[in-house]
């Protein structure tokens, strides 16, 4: 399974477990897959060996996952330092799980 699909699936599961009224109260609005892919496509991929990415409102990590996939598709040997910030403690476990998934997937031979 690709990174973005994994994050999208887990986000859907989270959305189903958290009532819309509660998400609205918390101000939770998650990026759709198509929007994340579009936003990632706007990023200029260079031939750098290392790149640092900051996601200041990471949510479940959809935007980060889309960008990581794009970067790896352009250069599978690139080193990506991803920093995610999220203040909603209800979303943090999903974000951490997906960040760990990304790390494992990118370290596979």
Indicate where each model-derived feature is located:
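SAM-dependent methyltransferase catalytic region
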Residues: 1-109
């Amino acid at each position: 399974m690709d990174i973005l699909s994994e994050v999208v699936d887990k986000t859907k599961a989270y959305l189903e477990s958290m009532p819309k009224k509660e998400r609205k109260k918390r101000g939770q609005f998650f990026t759709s897959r198509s929007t994340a892919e579009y936003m990632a496509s706007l990023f200029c991929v260079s031939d750098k060996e290392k790149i640092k990415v900051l996601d200041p409102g990471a949510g479940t990590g959809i935007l980060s996952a889309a960008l990581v996939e794009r970067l790896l598709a352009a250069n599978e040997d690139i080193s990506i330092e991803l920093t995610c910030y999220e203040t909603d403690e209800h979303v943090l476990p999903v974000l951490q799980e997906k960040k760990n998934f990304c790390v494992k997937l990118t370290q596979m031979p």
